[in-house]
Design a protein with these regions (language model features):
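Hydrophobic core segments of beta-strands in well-ordered, beta-rich domains
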Residues: 1-36, 41-44, 54-57, 71-75, ...
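Residues that flank catalytic or metal-binding motifs in active/ligand-binding sites
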Residues: 15, 39-42, 54, 70, ...
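Structural motif
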Residues: 36-42, 91-107, 157, 170
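A short local loop/turn or secondary-structure capping micro-motif enriched for an aromatic residue
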Residues: 36-38, 62-64, 91-93, 126, ...
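Conserved Ser/Thr-centered positions that define the repeating blades of beta-propeller domains
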Residues: 43-49, 109
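Beta-rich accessory regions
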Residues: 104-130, 135-219
Length: 219
């Protein structure tokens, strides 16, 4: 196995690095496939963004949640270590995971001594079929904000000449509450809200109009 890849890893399935800086060191997680054909997330470190050294395998699938793990992201939030990834070939599991390509959030503890994630919570990031490859960034005021691809390898309908077609989700602020990942639209969207209309006890029937609810954009 080439230097830098975890022993026994696939030479083809190694992609999607996510890089961040802590102090004078840079870190990167990447999607990888292990010897048993399932996903794993190796962690690397560098001082110059050119020479990278393998630190650990943060977590690995062991054929439990899909196969290849793509587009990983790793960060600490509200006292928890959080790993986001997009597994291929997921199997449906109750109402939490749908079959095919999906998303996965793993939370727990992780020491910066060994950089191994000890799981406490596993959940889907989004229950929609057209949601994939979420990535996060930190805003200047310290918020963890996530954006994802609003489409799926399983369901995209772009014409052959328009493979670039697609769109991204509304940015979401992340937080951890009671051991689960919470998401809310970024607060900057509030300034675009207009008049608020409240309707209560409306029976669900055929096509109907609600007083005060009109316009091209309704949230």
């Amino acid at each position: 196995c080439p230097e830098g890849l975890p022993k026994g890893s696939s030479l083809e399935d190694f992609r999607d690095p996510k890089i961040w800086q802590e102090g004078e060191s840079f870190y990167a997680v990447a999607g990888s496939r292990s010897r048993d054909g399932s996903g794993q997330i190796p962690l690397y470190t560098s001082k110059n963004l050119k020479d990278w050294s393998l630190v650990s395998i943060i977590d690995q699938c062991q054929n439990r949640y899909g196969k290849m793990w793509e587009c990983p992201d790793f960060f600490f939030l509200d006292g928890k270590a959080v790993l986001l990834t997009s597994p291929q070939d997921m199997e449906a599991e109750d109402f939490e995971f749908h079959s095919g390509n999906g998303t996965l959030c793993i939370m727990g503890t992780c020491s910066k001594e060994d950089w191994v994630l000890h799981r406490e919570q596993v959940q889907a990031i989004d229950y929609g079929l057209d949601f994939y490859a979420p990535q996060t960034t930190l805003t200047p005021d310290g918020r963890r904000v996530m954006v994802a691809w609003l489409q799926s390898w399983d369901n995209y309908l772009s014409p052959e000449s328009l493979y670039w077609g697609g769109m991204m989700t509304i940015p979401r602020e992340l937080s951890v509450k009671e051991g689960r990942l919470y998401q809310n639209p970024v607060r900057e969207l509030e300034k675009y809200h207009g008049k608020k209309t409240i309707a209560k006890k409306i029976p669900v029937q055929e096509k109907q109009s609600l007083e005060g609810a009109q316009g091209r954009q309704i949230d």
